[in-house]
Amino acid sequence: MSFFTTEFVNFKNRCVWSWNGFVHVCKTEASMRQWIIANIISGFFTFVAPISYTEQAILLAAGILILAAECMNTAIERVVDDISHEVRSAAQQAKDAASAAVAITATAAGVTWLVILLGVYL
């Protein structure tokens, strides 16, 4: 196979694997479904709010980053649970840190909304 054919096949495989992972998280994690609904609502408001295209892009990206953080959180939970189901402090700390990453990302998105809206309405 040529270089470009090989790279195309690799790219296609990565897309399929990524999609499969996203679908798995959506099917198994209620919090992911809740974040998707929040992103749909947030996305709607980005297009009706009197804000610039740049601000729209920033807000949409912030929402997408929450979804990425939720995927990473789920991946960490799966690996920790796969290693052992016994209660271990390091395992709990890893899971808590992954959850905190989602919370911090969501807080950053909320602060972004707040700053942009304050700029519009003040």
PLM regions: where:
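Short basic (Lys/Arg) and small-residue
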Residues: A94
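Hydrophobic alpha-helical transmembrane segments
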Residues: M1-R78, I83, V87-A90, S99-L122
